[in-house]
């Protein structure tokens, strides 16, 4: 765990002393957009035209933020058009690495040992956390984006004319509802598990974990007569929630002390999570070994021994 400071790697955990024990997530810095014609997107600069073979995605199978871009790459038939690297599950003194291991796909562009070296190729003076996902442009040799929510949106539409896949996970008639759901899920659940798990103050932890479960209670009620969060189809809102729920019992329940209830104690949420897991293409993007190895093995301030639990033994069949 660490970050870059003026282009120099520093092994440094999150600073919670200055925030009263609270975990505060930093804002991603690369915010350009791939568009069908290369015109500028909602943020950043233009020049990133959707082209087959031009872009490369760096992800971690353990990371929920990266995994949602991997799912969108799969669902939108982009695997033959956007190449892929997968980091090692352990993130220790050198951050994310490309060390050999099951499921690791080396850096085919630069043969990097560490992901921070990729960041430095885009900006030799970069300061900030080195996170996944990273969407790289081979033509201009820079990072297009390291913001997972925006990469999902790019994958959803920018390459439609290339792939012929017109499936829409952010349809116009549902966008307002999807945005509202995302605005609820992100702070309370996606980031909520981290705000509980990375807190270093008892009162802060208790506040955050109670807020998390209050949000889960609301979604349990919301799903009483629904298959999906919004409308009658799979949308980006489901993908964004799923990557947290699928990790809940394997890591967040124990490692992050989010243990008021397990996910299987929520019948509607558990059925919902299994439904998404069994959607065509989703299960193959989930690697429970990477997930458990990363959290239990990387966060030495939380789990100093690095022991990875054997369980839980969950049945993902519908």
Give the location of each predicted region.
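C-terminal alpha-helical interaction module
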Residues: 1-318
């Amino acid at each position: 765990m660490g970050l870059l400071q003026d282009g120099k790697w520093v092994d440094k955990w999150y600073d919670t002393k200055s925030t009263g024990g609270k975990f505060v997530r930093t804002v991603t810095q690369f915010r350009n957009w791939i568009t069908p014609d290369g015109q500028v997107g909602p943020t950043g600069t233009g020049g990133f035209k959707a082209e087959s073979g031009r872009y490369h995605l760096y992800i971690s199978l353990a990371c929920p933020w990266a995994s949602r871009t991997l799912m969108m790459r799969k669902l939108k038939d982009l695997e033959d058009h956007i190449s892929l690297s997968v980091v090692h599950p352990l993130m220790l003194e050198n951050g994310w690495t490309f060390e050999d291991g099951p499921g690791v796909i080396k850096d085919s562009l630069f043969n990097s040992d560490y992901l921070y070296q990729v960041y430095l190729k885009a900006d030799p003076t970069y300061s900030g956390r080195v996170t996944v996902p990273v969407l790289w442009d081979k033509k201009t040799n820079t990072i297009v984006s390291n913001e997972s929510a925006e990469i999902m949106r790019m994958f959803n539409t920018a390459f439609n004319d290339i792939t012929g896949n017109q499936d829409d996970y952010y349809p116009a008639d549902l966008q307002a509802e999807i945005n509202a759901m995302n605005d609820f899920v992100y702070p309370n659940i996606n980031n909520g598990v981290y705000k509980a798990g990375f807190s270093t103050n008892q009162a802060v932890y208790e506040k955050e974990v109670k807020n998390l479960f209050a949000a889960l209670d609301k979604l349990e009620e919301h799903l009483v007569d629904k298959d999906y969060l919004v409308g009658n189809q799979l949308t980006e809102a489901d993908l964004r929630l799923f990557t947290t729920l699928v990790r809940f019992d394997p890591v967040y329940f124990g490692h992050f002390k989010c243990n008021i209830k397990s996910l299987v104690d929520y019948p509607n949420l558990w059925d919902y999570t299994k439904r998404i897991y069994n959607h065509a293409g989703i299960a193959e993007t989930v690697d429970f070994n990477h997930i458990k190895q990363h959290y239990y093995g990387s966060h030495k301030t939380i789990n100093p021994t690095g022991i990875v639990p054997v369980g839980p033994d969950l049945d993902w069949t519908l």
